Amino acid sequence: MDEEGAPLSEGVQVVDPDVRAHVYSLVTALGGFNGESADRYVLGDDALACLRDIKRWLKLYDEKHNRMDVARCLGEANLVNGDLLPILTLWSTSGQKSKHMSRIALACLELLVPLTWPLEVHSEMTVNHHRHTPYLQQAQVLYKRGILSHGSGSILRTIIRIGLPSMAVPRSERTTRDEGILKLMLYFLRNIAVISPNARLAAEGDEEETSRSATINAFQNQDAFALLLTMCSNVGEDFSLQDVVLLEILFHIVKGVNVEKLFMNDAQRKAKRTDELGELLQKESSLRREYAKNAPTRHGRFGTMIWVKRDDAKVSTVSGQDVLKDSQTTLHKMDQSKKWNKPQIRRRAAEVTANNDFNTPVNINSTATKNLRMFVEEFLDSGFNPLFTHVRKAIEREADRVMDINTRQFFYTVAWFLEAERVRRAHQREKRHLGDTPLKEIEPDSFALVASVLNQETFVFLNRSMQYSYDNKDVEDLTAEMRCFTQILLTVQEMAQSPLEEDQEIADNIQNRIFYEETTHDRIVAIVRGYKDQGFGYLDACTELAHVFLRMLEHYSKENVDMHVRSRRRAKRKAKQAKQADIEGDDEEEASEEEDLMDVERISKERKFDFRRFAAKFCNQSCVDTFIAFTKYYRELNVDQLKRAHRYFYRIAFKQEMSVLLFRLDIINLFYRMIKGPGALDSNKPIFKEWEELVRQIIRRMIKKIDQRPALITELLFSKINSTVFYLEYGHEKQTISASKRPPAELEVEPREAKTIDEKIRIVVHVMVKDEHTDLVKWVSDVLNSAADEREAWESQEQHSGGQKAPNPMIPVKSDNESCQKAMFSNAKLRLLMSLVRFERLGMEDVPGASWVVPSSLNSQELRHTRSIIEQCLTEPVTENSDRDLSQLIRRKSGNNTRRDRDDQMANVDFGSDSEGDDNVPDGPLFPPNPRSRANALEQLKKQRKKRRKQAGEEEEPDEEDLEARRRARLENALARQAKIKSDLYIHASDEETDEEADQEFFRLEEQRRKEQAERIRKALLHGVVEEVSENSRKKSSGRKRQSDQYTASTADSQSKRQRRLQQTEGLDGNDDLVVAGTEARSPDSLGQGSPSLKGANDVEDTLVTSEENELDFDDDLAFSRNRTRDKVLSAENDDSDTEPPAPDTIDEDGEEAAAVAAPPRRRVRAGFVIESDSE
């Protein structure tokens, strides 16, 4: 313990002397170097007990009392370098087989872990902590130097040997002691990786011995990297509790290391360093030149003071020889002398985490670069997926071993290794392109090596963590998460450019999932807007994320034109005034969870994505200020960072046409200095030309805009709000149109409860009175009263005017009360009452302020009658004890009624035909699809409805696939039935061919049918009866109906055009003035089976028209009969119809044995005159 120790300031008692005496005695009794053999350490008689006592002092005194006195004493006594490291060397050389020595070695490890535990400066430190922390930090650096460069042995390899027996035990057989030994071993490696020289303390010795390069080389030479690879590749199988410690070790090894330099060869690295040195020398020379311009001369070092006369006739004093150069320099010197005490914003004190700072770059030597690159490549090939999958799951379930800092370490380490994988692949492609021998061939599924962080679970975890860090203002965590998100996007972009189709499909799927959520878009915009002095690391991360996200999203939206995003908005629910809140409170509490889920479903909806609309969110002064703050570091930025800022300003000024946002004095001054100086960009850089052209175009646009808008000269001093931007861009203020409110839903009174208008008015009035809207009801009554008086005066004036009738004027419905005017639009029950009293709204638009009038069709008596009903309801008390609630009788007007009303209005409108050649067919389509008709179709529909109601609660509703399958089956059945039809009514190509014999036979049969029909009609006119049709004819007719061969008899529309042209050329046999009305007697050929839709009385009159009736031009509105009271049934037997008994005015068409009914004669009438005919 006499070797080098940490310096102690004498004369100051920082530790209790009794504590120091006890600790020193334990260290002395532990052992020491023998005088005979100075290189050999000799243990004391009770060394193991001494080590355990020292451990108890650390635990019971320092940890229990939250002090560092024992650790300070051990550092002063040089316990680590003077005793513990020699004991471990002794065990590794000669004592591994001794169980006693193994226990001593383990006891040494138990002391090394707490003594090398990293120290952090935090807000909960006591005075004792502040006193001892600097000394202990310096002591730990000495511990690390002794561990890494111990002369007589490899300490790290020795520590690993202590833990190897516990690693060899299967996980299921390990004891708590084995798990503790593994934990001690890994924590010791973690501590060695964390310890680094403190820049605020004076360094002792060579810093290279404790640098990152020395740590990496020691880990490689002493098999620590091999241990880490073995454990990382078996996490989850053999090592489940060590995942977080392994993550910490990796984080502290790779943090701050430049990935690009890591994968460079020696020649590239040498060229890179030469370029960096040249840039530094050039910066130095430029600074010297700038200084030489204003530097004092050798003989001009005496004081200089001048007076500067300003515009307001005031005089200012400026000192210094440099002010004599020119007036511009003088004014610049005056500006430099001004100071602005900017008010400091009180912020939450940020915790200093020097050990976890990953924004500070670290340089490593060539040997360490080679060793680290080998370890990184092997880790990517074997340990990446198992480790990060297991750590992510542990963080998500909040395991006990997970600390808050581990989330930041996880995301940063993932981002670093993803970037390493991309750079490795790029260098391998470059080597193959140059013809060099590749170190390793990339497998076709090589992206599977990092697939564990490209799944949906990682994206959800990342988005949730980013939102949590943003909400809680955790700057460091959010920076790590933004870096991780950026590297994931870049990796996916590289996957999309892969020659493998599988990689391209996976990349497209990942981009679809990332870009589908609009909350991700909004979060990135909010992060960029919210920058306020969070540091350069945060600034670099957020600008890089915005740049990569915008570029990839623009490319993806161009490839996927129909891209949709899911937007989630918080539902705006109006508070309802419910008087029965106490009664229904319990029910609402039970259903609250379901209602919340329903609300989430309602507010999540898809919409088409517009990239220009999204890019416009970055066109605001906050985002511009963020990138301006980033650009102010232009002297320290590399080419990629300068290009990032250039692309953003180019997008703002030229793509989005929002260059007005850049017209601010400090921004223009920054751009000018970047190009013209002082302190300009290096003109040899490739990015300089692009920046020069951009600045030239921006200043050119600004001058042009000043000529157009002189007000811009004043606005150059300030940031631009949206209204100012719009005015400067277009020359006028933005015209905003307030969105009109939607009218309330239409209401109606239950038709079954109120048959008449008076009953409906009573119900509505009672409900409005119950809802405390009596003032509105009285207003309607007053309007009716005044309208009745005015209408009475108008009617009396008409009576005195001598009989000349003028239309009654419409009376406007107005109100001086503003609340009443609003209620005319927003109160649905008032609108219902106004509709019931027959007020009408002018115009088609239902907007606030629409005019209502009393129509001219209402006379004074009707108005007074309506008012009397309202007054009667107001005087009658509302019965509260009624069995039914009147408010339940008012319901929302159903969409079916509205649709039916619209259909009724459009029923008589002829829109023409979309088919080629519009044949004017007044009675329907020329060729109907011939649906299958059923005599009991109505009954079948009723049974189906009842069956559905019964099965509604038992079976689930059919989904869209089942409905589509049923629809296809119905279509196939209809096509199969149509295929069986043999009728020549359907037009074929062969109809154009002429067959004279067939035409003659057709004309002969048609002439015979016309004569027979004319004879039957003539007999019916003379005798008033219809002759019986023969049984054979009836059976033939029914047989033809079943075969669908006489489809022409069921509808007049089924005749072909050729038949109609022939019938129109035939003349009438009798008197030209003979008008024969439609008869109820029909020939057997005219009785066909029609569809159920053709069974109404009107349909029968419209469809059952024979060829003779068309020829004689019958009028369907006239029916002939000699005696209307005589209905003589001639035959009513053999009626096998299954349908219901026909109505008196209809004929049973479904039965095969239709009964012939005597047609009652009727006088023929034309133009109101009775016409007698000789035919009678």
Curated annotation (Swiss-Prot):
Report if keyword DNA damage is assigned.
yes
Predominant location: nucleus
Basic and acidic residues compositional bias: what residue ranges? 981-991
Q: Where is the composition biased (Polar residues)?
A: 1045-1054
- Kindly list the places in or outside the cell where this protein is found, as annotated in its UniProt entry: Nucleus
Function, please? Forms a fork protection complex (FPC) with csm3 and which is required for chromosome segregation during meiosis and DNA damage repair. FPC coordinates leading and lagging strand synthesis and moves with the replication fork. FPC stabilizes replication forks in a configuration that is recognized by replication checkpoint sensors.
Mind telling me what this protein is named?
Answer: Topoisomerase 1-associated factor 1
Originating organism: Aspergillus fumigatus (strain ATCC MYA-4609 / CBS 101355 / FGSC A1100 / Af293)
